[in-house]
């Protein structure tokens, strides 16, 4: 492919789809991608599609900076959307990613953070279902070839799982 995409601004597509694809994809500074809508979240693809499927071009390196936000929330009723951040080699994923179900009703969405060879992950991720009884939380798929948890991350993960 040989092309690079760097985004530092804001893109909004209420309930729609945003695709940032290329050989190297970077979301930097205070970049914002938002496909949230009142009745359900849309889809954001950064660097590839679900589990690296060849339906779209796949990035070798994907970076989501620490001040970046990616949102695919249902704002009122409806299900959270889908956020895929993917790289065939290295994914550096920081910032905030949300695919929440609606405040009144709706299930959480899907968030995938994957680097086939290397995944550097410090992102805040939320795919919950805050509204109504019987709503189901979403899915966070973490899919590197090798997964390393540092001691602080293990302690934080344990604390979250106990609450």
Please provide the spans of the model-predicted regions.
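Extracellular and secretory-pathway beta-repeat/beta-biased strand scaffolds
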Residues: 1-163
């Amino acid at each position: 492919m040989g092309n690079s995409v760097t985004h530092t601004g804001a893109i909004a597509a209420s309930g729609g789809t945003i695709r940032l694809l290329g050989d190297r994809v970077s979301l930097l500074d205070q970049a914002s991608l938002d496909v949230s809508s009142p009745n359900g979240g849309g889809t954001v693809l950064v660097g590839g599609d679900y589990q690296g499927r060849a339906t779209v071009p796949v990035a070798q390196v994907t970076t989501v900076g620490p001040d970046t936000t990616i949102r695919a929330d249902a704002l009122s009723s409806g299900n959270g959307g889908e956020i895929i951040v993917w790289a065939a080699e290295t994914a550096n994923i920081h910032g905030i990613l949300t695919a929440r179900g609606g405040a009144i009703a709706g299930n959480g969405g899907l968030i995938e953070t994957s680097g086939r060879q290397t995944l550097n992950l410090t992102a805040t991720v939320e795919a919950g279902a805050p509204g109504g009884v019987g709503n189901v939380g979403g899915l966070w798929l973490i899919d590197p070839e090798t997964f390393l948890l540092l001691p602080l991350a293990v302690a934080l993960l344990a604390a979250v799982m106990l609450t």
